[in-house]
From Swiss-Prot:
Residues 71-176 are annotated as: Disordered. Residues 140-152 have a biased composition (Basic residues). It comes from the Viruses. InterPro entries: ChaB, ChaB_sf. It comes from Orgyia pseudotsugata multicapsid polyhedrosis virus. Residues 77-87, 100-109 have a biased composition (Low complexity). This is Uncharacterized 19.9 kDa protein.
Length: 176
C-alpha cells in the first residue's frame, strides 16, 4: 500500500514531514482493491500543496517559510543595494519599525492622558483609542489590566433588596 505514494516523491527532495503528510493522506483516502488510487493520489497531492511549496522543480519547503523568504526578499529589494551592506539590511529595518511604533504608541497615550485631564469623560477616551488603533499597528505595548466584572454575579448595589415589587395604589393615575 505504501509503494504507490512512494512513486510520486522518489526523485523529489521532500522533508520527512511532507512525506509523512502525503502517505497519511493517501492511506486515509485509499481503499484496498477499490480502484481509487488516482483520487487518493490527487487528494494527497492537494494536502501536500496546501502546506508545502515546490521550489526548483524538485525541492519542497513549508509554505510559511516560503512566505518569509519572499517577504525578506521584497523588503531587501525596496531598501536598495546602496543603502546598506548586503548582510546587514534586515536588522536595522526591524529596529526602525519598532521605534516608530513605540513613538506613535506613546503619542497616542499622551493624547489620551490629555483628553482625560481636560474633559474627564471615559466615552471620549474609548472613542479616541479605537480610532488610534489602526495607526499604532501590531507593535504597540500592552494596555494596563482592567478589573473585569464576572458574568453571573450580581453586585450588591444591583441586588433587589425589597421583599416584593412595590406598586402605586394611587387612583389618580388610572382615571380613564
Amino acid at each position: 500500500m505504501y509503494h504507490l505514494p512512494d512513486t510520486l516523491y522518489e526523485q523529489e527532495k521532500m522533508p520527512r514531514r511532507a512525506k509523512r503528510l502525503f502517505v497519511d493522506t493517501f492511506s486515509q483516502h485509499h481503499k484496498l482493491n477499490a480502484g481509487d488510487e488516482e483520487a487518493a493520489m490527487q487528494k494527497a497531492r492537494q494536502a501536500l500543496e496546501e502546506r508545502y511549496v515546490r521550489v526548483n522543480d524538485l525541492q519542497w519547503i513549508p509554505r510559511r517559510a516560503a512566505y518569509e523568504i519572499i517577504r525578506d526578499d521584497m523588503s531587501s529589494d525596496s531598501d536598495g543595494p546602496a543603502a546598506s551592506p548586503p548582510g546587514d539590511h534586515a536588522r536595522p529595518n526591524r529596529d526602525k519599525r519598532r521605534v516608530s511604533y513605540s513613538s506613535s504608541d506613546s503619542s497616542a497615550r499622551s493624547s489620551d492622558d490629555q483628553l482625560i485631564s481636560a474633559r474627564g469623560s471615559d466615552d471620549q477616551l474609548i472613542s479616541t483609542r479605537s480610532s488610534d488603533d489602526h495607526l499604532v499597528g501590531a507593535g504597540k505595548a500592552r494596555r494596563p489590566a482592567r478589573k473585569k466584572k464576572r458574568i453571573g454575579k450580581v453586585v450588591a448595589s444591583q441586588k433587589f433588596v425589597g421583599g416584593g415589587a412595590q406598586y402605586s395604589t394611587d387612583d389618580d393615575e388610572d382615571d380613564y
